[in-house]
Every structure is written in C-alpha cells, then in structure tokens.
C-alpha cells in the first residue's frame, strides 16, 4: 500500500472526464498485456514522486512549460525511476498532449477502474500522521464491513489535518480531521458572537 508523506498531496484531486478517458484507455491496454498490477505499481510510484516534489508538482500543473519541456522532463524522470513500458509511454503521451495537470486524476481513475475490475473498492485515505499496520488493518476492516466489499487503500499523509483522517470512496467522503472540526467550531462561534 503506497504511502506518500506530504503537506500538499495532489492525489486527492477530483477525477475529470479527461482523466477518466485516459485512465480507461490505459487500463484496457494494461489488461490486454496482462500487466494491470505492474501498471498500478508504476502509477503509484509516480504519484508518490509528485506528492513528494514541489518541483514536479510545478512541472505537472504550470502552463509555463512547453509540451517539449514537459515531455523531456517526464522522459528523464521515467528513466531515472525505472518507470518504463506502458506507463512510461503513457506519461510521455500525456505530456505531449499537454494533459500533465490531469495525471493525479488519471491515477485515481485507474485505481478505481482496477479495483472495480477486481471486485473491490478503492479508498483514498489522507491521515494527519502515518498509520501503523494495525490501524491500517482496522480501518480496512471497518470500511469492508461498511461497504460489504474488499477495500484497497491508498494512504497519504497530510500534517495540515492536525489529527484524524479523510476517507474518500468514489463520490463519498468521510472527514474526521481535526482541521475540519476546528473550522466548524470557528464558524459556530462566529454565529454566536
């Protein structure tokens, strides 16, 4: 289960129609090649690289870079990280098409499609602190009993939550973060005062 330690995770991006189409195409190619798990692993590693690097986040989101600059940088990153084959070519194509901004959504969509194909649900979990293996197991079991399906979790760490976690499964979100509770309390106090 991939874990990225970051104060500004990009993996929580909403999934757009563009991201869904790209992810669906990548999934079909991976399924035909029998490499869905390998592709998922490479995508998870690339997402962790995005989450951990402000420079890579800028490359992915900034329109200031040309498609040639983005494609060249992505090719170098893929070579260095040994992300080749299907995912390497996919990322280079996405860069050439000036769609790098949608990569986090594409990765999230791929995870959902792959989980659905396996009869599972994909859950994006953002925690204020790294979860222990026991906490991960307990959360996975709680989500399984709530949904009735096996759950694959993708965990990121966001210290700005202060405490608690945010769990996203499809269009549903459960936010038990201390940051949200404090914001709610602040609004309630403004209404009273």
From Swiss-Prot:
Its main location: membrane. The keyword Membrane applies. The lineage of its organism: Bacteria, Pseudomonadati, Pseudomonadota, Alphaproteobacteria, Hyphomicrobiales. Belongs to the ATPase delta chain family. This is ATP synthase subunit delta. PROSITE patterns: ATPASE_DELTA. One of its GO terms (molecular function) is proton-transporting ATP synthase activity, rotational mechanism. One of its GO terms (cellular component) is proton-transporting ATP synthase complex. It comes from Allorhizobium ampelinum (strain ATCC BAA-846 / DSM 112012 / S4) (Agrobacterium vitis (strain S4)).
């Amino acid at each position: 289960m991939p874990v990225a330690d970051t104060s500004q995770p990009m993996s929580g991006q909403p999934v757009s129609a563009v991201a869904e189409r790209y992810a669906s195409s990548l999934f079909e190619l991976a399924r035909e090649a029998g490499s869905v798990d390998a592709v998922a692993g490479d995508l998870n590693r690339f997402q962790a690289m995005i989450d951990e690097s402000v420079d890579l986040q800028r490359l992915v989101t900034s329109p200031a870079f040309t498609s040639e600059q983005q494609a060249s940088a992505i090719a170098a990153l893929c070579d260095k990280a040994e992300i080749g084959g299907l995912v390497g070519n996919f990322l280079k194509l996405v860069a050439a098409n000036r769609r790098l901004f949608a990569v986090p959504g594409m990765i999230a969509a791929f995870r959902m499609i792959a989980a659905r194909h396996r009869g599972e649900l994909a859950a994006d979990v953002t925690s204020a602190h790294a979860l222990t293996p026991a906490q991960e197991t307990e959360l996975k079991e709680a989500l399984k009993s709530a949904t009735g399906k096996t759950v694959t979790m993708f965990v990121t760490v966001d210290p700005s939550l202060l405490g608690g976690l945010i769990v996203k499964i499809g269009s549903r979100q459960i936010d038990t973060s201390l940051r949200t509770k404090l914001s709610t309390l602040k609004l309630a106090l403004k209404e009273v005062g």
